[in-house]
């Protein structure tokens, strides 16, 4: 509902949706980023085709931040890009594991919220690069260039690491209390 309202009110949203629907009709203008991204992913082969530095990643606008996934797929191959997605998904799964192991509701919800934010950021970035959704300009956590993005992601990882240590100490304390009660 909000997306429909935003599409009607904001012109930049209308432009992004139009580029998402048919980027090749605007290849000389606003569709250049998405078209070059799709060309890079398509020419990257399944595995390392030309070698590092022998592709043409400089043709992709904003290649260091928003469209780094297409550069990775072109330089290292689509299989490497899929492996990167699996690494990011495994981070999310670990966040959910820490969330389920926490005993306190606040810790569970905090870890769950950070994990969903992390996954949503990955989805927005890779989805925009592959034309699955309109491009949003969101970076891939810890992969794309962007100082604020890297710092905030590292803070999130540190908080989740702290929650993991708390979950371990809570588990040890719970087992200790349970052992004392059984004696």
Residue ranges and their predicted role:
Residues 10-14, 96-103, 136, 163, ...:
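Membrane-interfacial segments
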Residues 59, 71-74, 114-118, 142-146:
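Transmembrane helix-bundle signature of multi-pass membrane transporters/permeases
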Residues 84-91:
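Transmembrane alpha-helices of multi-pass, membrane-embedded glycan-processing enzymes
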Residues 1-83, 103-110:
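Hydrophobic, glycine- and aromatic-enriched re-entrant/interface helices and adjoining loop segments
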Residues 98-137, 143:
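Loop-to-helix entry and N-terminal half of a specific, functionally important transmembrane alpha helix
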Residues 3-7, 87, 116-124:
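Alpha-helical transmembrane segments of multi-pass membrane proteins
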Residues 125-183:
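A juxtamembrane structural motif centered on a specific transmembrane helix
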Residues 78, 94-107, 173-183:
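Membrane-proximal intracellular helices of multi-pass ion channels
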């Amino acid at each position: 509902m909000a997306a429909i309202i935003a599409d009607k009110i904001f012109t930049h949203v209308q432009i992004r949706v139009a580029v998402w629907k048919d980027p090749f009709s605007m290849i000389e203008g606003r569709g250049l980023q998405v078209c070059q991204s799709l060309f890079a992913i398509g020419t990257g082969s399944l595995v390392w085709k030309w070698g590092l530095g022998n592709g043409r990643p400089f043709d992709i606008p904003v290649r260091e931040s928003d469209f780094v996934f297409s550069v990775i797929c072109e330089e290292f191959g689509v299989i490497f890009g899929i492996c990167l997605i699996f690494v990011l998904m495994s981070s999310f799964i670990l966040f959910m594991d820490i969330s389920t192991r926490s005993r306190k509701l606040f810790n569970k919800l905090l870890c769950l919220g950070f994990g969903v934010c992390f996954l949503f950021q990955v989805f927005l970035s890779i989805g925009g690069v592959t034309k699955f959704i309109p491009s949003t300009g969101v970076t891939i956590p810890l992969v794309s260039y962007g100082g604020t993005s890297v710092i905030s992601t590292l803070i999130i990882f540190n908080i989740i690491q702290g929650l993991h240590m708390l979950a371990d100490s809570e588990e040890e304390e719970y087992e200790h209390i349970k052992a004392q009660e059984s004696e």
